[in-house]
Protein backbone atom coordinates (compact mmCIF):
# COMPACT_ATOMS: atom_id res chain seq x y z
CA UNK A 1 0.00 0.00 0.00
CA UNK A 2 2.82 2.41 0.92
CA UNK A 3 4.58 1.73 -2.38
CA UNK A 4 1.37 2.34 -4.35
CA UNK A 5 0.83 5.59 -2.44
CA UNK A 6 4.44 6.60 -3.07
CA UNK A 7 5.28 6.97 0.61
CA UNK A 8 7.93 5.31 2.76
CA UNK A 9 7.01 2.61 5.26
CA UNK A 10 8.76 2.48 8.64
CA UNK A 11 8.18 -0.80 10.47
CA UNK A 12 8.80 -0.72 14.22
CA UNK A 13 9.33 -3.62 16.64
CA UNK A 14 10.75 -5.96 14.01
CA UNK A 15 11.24 -9.15 16.00
CA UNK A 16 11.14 -12.13 13.68
CA UNK A 17 12.97 -13.49 10.68
CA UNK A 18 9.85 -13.46 8.49
CA UNK A 19 9.31 -9.73 8.98
CA UNK A 20 12.98 -9.03 8.32
CA UNK A 21 12.85 -11.10 5.13
CA UNK A 22 9.73 -9.27 3.92
CA UNK A 23 11.49 -5.93 4.48
CA UNK A 24 14.62 -7.19 2.71
CA UNK A 25 12.63 -8.36 -0.33
CA UNK A 26 10.71 -5.08 -0.52
CA UNK A 27 13.95 -3.09 -0.38
CA UNK A 28 15.45 -5.28 -3.13
CA UNK A 29 12.50 -4.25 -5.30
CA UNK A 30 13.36 -0.60 -4.65
CA UNK A 31 10.60 0.12 -2.15
CA UNK A 32 11.27 2.65 0.59
CA UNK A 33 10.79 0.31 3.52
CA UNK A 34 12.71 0.59 6.78
CA UNK A 35 12.94 -1.82 9.69
CA UNK A 36 13.61 -1.12 13.35
CA UNK A 37 14.31 -3.94 15.82
CA UNK A 38 14.48 -3.18 19.53
CA UNK A 39 17.71 -3.67 21.46
CA UNK A 40 15.79 -5.87 23.91
CA UNK A 41 14.65 -8.15 21.08
CA UNK A 42 18.23 -8.42 19.80
CA UNK A 43 19.63 -9.48 23.16
CA UNK A 44 16.96 -11.27 25.21
CA UNK A 45 15.25 -14.45 24.03
CA UNK A 46 12.02 -16.31 24.70
CA UNK A 47 13.40 -17.91 27.87
CA UNK A 48 12.80 -14.56 29.61
CA UNK A 49 9.04 -15.10 29.43
CA UNK A 50 9.00 -18.65 30.75
CA UNK A 51 11.28 -18.04 33.71
CA UNK A 52 9.97 -19.82 36.80
CA UNK A 53 10.44 -16.61 38.79
CA UNK A 54 7.09 -14.99 38.01
CA UNK A 55 8.36 -11.51 38.93
CA UNK A 56 11.24 -11.93 36.47
CA UNK A 57 8.90 -13.09 33.71
CA UNK A 58 6.41 -10.28 34.45
CA UNK A 59 9.15 -7.66 34.15
CA UNK A 60 9.83 -8.96 30.61
CA UNK A 61 6.28 -8.68 29.26
CA UNK A 62 6.37 -6.52 26.14
CA UNK A 63 5.06 -6.56 22.58
CA UNK A 64 6.13 -8.21 20.50
CA UNK A 65 7.30 -10.97 22.83
CA UNK A 66 10.88 -12.18 22.86
CA UNK A 67 11.73 -14.70 20.15
CA UNK A 68 14.22 -17.53 19.71
CA UNK A 69 17.93 -17.08 18.97
CA UNK A 70 17.28 -17.95 15.30
CA UNK A 71 15.19 -14.82 14.92
CA UNK A 72 17.86 -12.76 16.69
CA UNK A 73 20.52 -14.04 14.27
CA UNK A 74 18.41 -12.89 11.33
CA UNK A 75 17.94 -9.43 12.84
CA UNK A 76 21.67 -9.01 13.52
CA UNK A 77 22.37 -10.08 9.92
CA UNK A 78 19.86 -7.47 8.74
CA UNK A 79 21.64 -4.73 10.65
CA UNK A 80 24.97 -5.84 9.17
CA UNK A 81 23.66 -5.93 5.61
CA UNK A 82 21.60 -2.75 5.86
CA UNK A 83 18.24 -4.43 5.27
CA UNK A 84 17.35 -3.24 8.80
CA UNK A 85 18.36 0.32 9.56
CA UNK A 86 17.74 1.50 13.12
CA UNK A 87 17.89 0.02 16.63
CA UNK A 88 15.44 1.54 19.11
CA UNK A 89 14.09 0.72 22.58
CA UNK A 90 10.38 1.59 22.68
CA UNK A 91 11.19 2.61 26.25
CA UNK A 92 8.15 1.92 28.44
CA UNK A 93 9.45 1.35 31.93
CA UNK A 94 7.37 0.07 34.81
CA UNK A 95 8.39 -0.74 38.36
CA UNK A 96 8.37 -4.31 39.64
CA UNK A 97 5.35 -3.37 41.74
CA UNK A 98 3.47 -2.16 38.65
CA UNK A 99 4.37 -5.32 36.72
CA UNK A 100 3.34 -7.45 39.71
CA UNK A 101 -0.22 -6.07 39.44
CA UNK A 102 -0.93 -8.68 36.79
CA UNK A 103 1.05 -11.55 38.27
CA UNK A 104 -2.04 -13.80 38.36
CA UNK A 105 -3.30 -12.71 34.94
CA UNK A 106 -0.62 -11.87 32.39
CA UNK A 107 -3.18 -10.03 30.25
CA UNK A 108 -3.17 -7.11 32.69
CA UNK A 109 0.59 -6.86 33.23
CA UNK A 110 1.66 -3.41 31.99
CA UNK A 111 3.22 -3.96 28.58
CA UNK A 112 6.73 -2.59 28.08
CA UNK A 113 10.33 -2.58 29.12
CA UNK A 114 13.05 -0.10 29.89
CA UNK A 115 15.90 0.35 27.44
CA UNK A 116 16.63 3.99 26.71
CA UNK A 117 19.43 4.33 29.25
CA UNK A 118 21.00 1.02 28.25
CA UNK A 119 20.57 1.04 24.46
CA UNK A 120 24.01 2.27 23.43
CA UNK A 121 25.96 0.23 25.97
CA UNK A 122 24.04 -2.98 25.29
CA UNK A 123 24.23 -2.56 21.52
CA UNK A 124 27.97 -1.88 21.73
CA UNK A 125 28.60 -4.87 24.01
CA UNK A 126 26.35 -7.33 22.16
CA UNK A 127 26.99 -5.90 18.69
CA UNK A 128 30.46 -4.44 18.31
CA UNK A 129 32.31 -6.40 20.98
CA UNK A 130 30.95 -9.71 19.63
CA UNK A 131 31.75 -8.84 16.01
CA UNK A 132 28.11 -8.65 14.93
CA UNK A 133 28.48 -4.95 14.08
CA UNK A 134 31.41 -2.77 13.13
CA UNK A 135 31.83 0.55 14.95
CA UNK A 136 30.56 2.28 11.76
CA UNK A 137 27.46 0.04 11.66
CA UNK A 138 26.86 0.90 15.32
CA UNK A 139 26.89 4.63 14.52
CA UNK A 140 24.67 4.08 11.48
CA UNK A 141 22.03 2.09 13.40
CA UNK A 142 21.95 4.51 16.33
CA UNK A 143 22.22 7.88 14.59
CA UNK A 144 23.05 8.29 10.91
CA UNK A 145 20.36 6.07 9.39
CA UNK A 146 17.44 7.58 11.30
CA UNK A 147 18.64 11.08 10.42
CA UNK A 148 18.65 10.07 6.74
CA UNK A 149 15.21 8.43 6.98
CA UNK A 150 13.77 11.58 8.59
CA UNK A 151 15.49 13.82 6.01
CA UNK A 152 17.46 15.73 8.63
CA UNK A 153 20.88 14.45 7.56
CA UNK A 154 23.57 15.90 7.59
CA UNK A 155 22.22 18.54 10.00
CA UNK A 156 21.75 15.59 12.37
CA UNK A 157 23.43 12.19 12.35
CA UNK A 158 26.88 13.36 11.26
CA UNK A 159 29.89 15.09 12.71
CA UNK A 160 30.59 17.58 9.96
CA UNK A 161 31.00 21.32 9.67
CA UNK A 162 27.60 23.02 9.86
CA UNK A 163 25.86 20.10 11.59
CA UNK A 164 24.29 20.41 15.02
CA UNK A 165 26.77 19.43 17.72
CA UNK A 166 24.71 16.55 19.11
CA UNK A 167 27.35 14.21 20.50
CA UNK A 168 27.19 11.41 23.04
CA UNK A 169 30.39 10.72 24.92
CA UNK A 170 30.53 7.53 26.92
CA UNK A 171 33.12 4.97 27.92
CA UNK A 172 32.22 1.53 26.50
CA UNK A 173 34.66 -0.08 28.93
CA UNK A 174 32.65 0.94 32.02
CA UNK A 175 30.77 -2.02 33.45
CA UNK A 176 27.49 -2.05 35.32
CA UNK A 177 24.78 -4.53 36.16
CA UNK A 178 21.35 -4.11 34.60
CA UNK A 179 18.66 -5.68 36.74
Which stretches of residues belong to each language-model region?
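His/Asp/Glu-enriched, well-ordered alpha-helical/loop segment
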Residues: 3-6, 59, 81, 85-87, ...
Amino acid sequence: IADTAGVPLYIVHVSCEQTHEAIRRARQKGMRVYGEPLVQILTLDESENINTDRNHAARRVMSPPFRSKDHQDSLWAGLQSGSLQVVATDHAAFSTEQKRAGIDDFRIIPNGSNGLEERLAVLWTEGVETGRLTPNEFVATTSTNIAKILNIYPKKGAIVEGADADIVVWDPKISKTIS
